[in-house]
UniProtKB/Swiss-Prot annotation:
It is an enzyme of class 5 (isomerase). Its EC number is 5.1.1.3. The gene is murI. Gene3D superfamilies: 3.40.50.1860. It comes from Bifidobacterium longum (strain NCC 2705). SUPFAM superfamilies: Aspartate/glutamate racemase. The active site is at 74 (proton donor/acceptor), 193 (proton donor/acceptor). This is Glutamate racemase. Provides the (R)-glutamate required for cell wall biosynthesis. Keywords: Cell shape, Cell wall biogenesis/degradation, Isomerase, Peptidoglycan synthesis. It catalyses: L-glutamate = D-glutamate. GO terms for biological process: cell wall organization; peptidoglycan biosynthetic process; regulation of cell shape. GO terms for molecular function: glutamate racemase activity. It holds the Pfam family Asp_Glu_race.
């Protein structure tokens, strides 16, 4: 596989565009093929078997296009399908997971040998939070921290329907999920769905200034770079990169919204 081959990136819909955008920013020589499966969104309320089948269809499409790696820019699809995909294909398959370690590590202060327990909300889809993969992740950190799981399926739908700019709707939806918490005593919110990255500024309105809003995009893209470099597959520095957008929903509305989110 040539180092100039493209990277395939996919999501249940439009959220993974935030990951494609991060690749374009951090690895500008890379050519990205993005596929959003908006016709089948949301994945977060489907069964693991349904998500696996959809994920295999998309990766097969990428393989036919000659990609050198695939990024599953979807926490839900990662939870349901990443292990099976890695067993089936001989190209790197990079998954996502909620950046819980980053959130909990904020309790480790160099000047203090004792961990300061963190109060963390993980906002994600229902399926991500139900899957064994997330349970194992929680097991690593919940003994020294307080971790709240908050499924937020409506946040996916708001992005997919193009209503992200409706401030009243978004804040009303966020308050519906998060007013049950004493936000003044929350240390961070982990955005465990790539759709939710587009809500960062809204979460900032909800949280005290000292609290962090954390997503896994930068870490995922950094890992992608390390993997490609180890295989000698990074694109030449003088290559012209970019992002090509495709979607299972062929409507102009989705195409226009995809372009808009890529350039936010």
């Amino acid at each position: 596989m040539s180092s100039s081959a493209p990277i395939g990136v996919f999501d249940s819909g439009l959220g993974g565009i935030s990951v494609a955008r991060q690749i374009a920013k951090d690895m500008p020589a890379e050519h990205v093929l993005y596929f959003g499966d908006s016709a089948n969104a949301p994945y977060g309320i489907k069964t693991p078997e349904q998500v696996r089948a959809l994920s295999f269809d998309i990766v097969e499409r990428f393989v036919r296009q000659g990609v050198k790696a695939v990024v599953i820019a979807c926490n839900t699809a990662t939870s349901a399908a990443v292990n099976d995909l890695r067993e089936h294909y001989d190209i790197p398959i990079i998954g996502m997971e909620p950046a819980l370690k980053v959130a909990c590590d904020r309790g480790d202060v160099p000047s203090d040998p004792h961990h300061i327990p963190q109060r963390v909300i993980v906002a994600a889809t229902p399926l991500t939070l139900r899957e064994r993969k997330f349970a194992k992740l929680m097991d690593r950190f919940d003994s020294n921290n307080t971790i709240f799981k908050e499924p937020c399926p409506d946040l996916v739908e708001i992005v997919e329907s193009g209503r992200l700019g409706d401030h009243d709707l978004v804040m009303r939806t966020l308050h519906g999920y998060f007013d049950q918490y004493d936000m003044e005593h929350i240390d961070s919110v982990v955005l465990g769905c790539t759709h939710f990255v587009f809500y960062r500024d809204y979460f900032r309105e909800l949280l005290p200034e000292r609290a962090a809003v954390i997503d896994g995009n930068e870490g995922t893209v950094r890992h992608l770079g390390v993997v490609l470099e180890s295989l000698g597959k990074l694109a030449p520095e003088d290559a012209t990169g970019g992002v090509e957008l495709a979607n299972s929903d062929p409507s102009e509305r989705i195409a226009e919204l995809s372009r808009k989110l890529l350039n936010v």
